[in-house]
Amino acid sequence: MNIRTASFTFIVVMMILSQTMADRFFNEPEEDDHLVESWNPFKKIAHRHCYPKNECITTNGKKTCKDYSCCQIVLFGKKTRSACTVVAQ
């Protein structure tokens, strides 16, 4: 095997492995707490970004508000969709 074939094989294998790891983060945002914690030394590569969100609805002159806590995973600078949970009504 010459150097070009070895380099090409290495690049293909690295792309497959990185896609497999990224797929875990992007498809399972609710169940990945243990994965993010295991990546703590690599916070610049993968970390969780949480922020508060407030949503108010006015119905028949009565205003009701809900507070949410929304979190998303940032992996290599790309953000996943937010998963929000109700904190208070």
UniProtKB/Swiss-Prot annotation:
GO terms for biological process: defense response to bacterium; defense response to fungus; killing of cells of another organism. It comes from the Eukaryota. This is Strongylocin 2. The modification 6'-bromotryptophan is found at residue 39. The keyword Hydrolase does not apply. Has antimicrobial activity against Gram-negative bacteria and Gram-positive bacteria with minimum inhibitory concentration (MIC) between 0.78 uM and 3.13 uM. Keywords: Antibiotic, Antimicrobial, Bromination, Disulfide bond, Fungicide, Signal. Residues 1-22 form the signal peptide. It comes from Echinus esculentus (Sea urchin). Residues 23-38 form a propeptide. Contains 3 disulfide bonds.
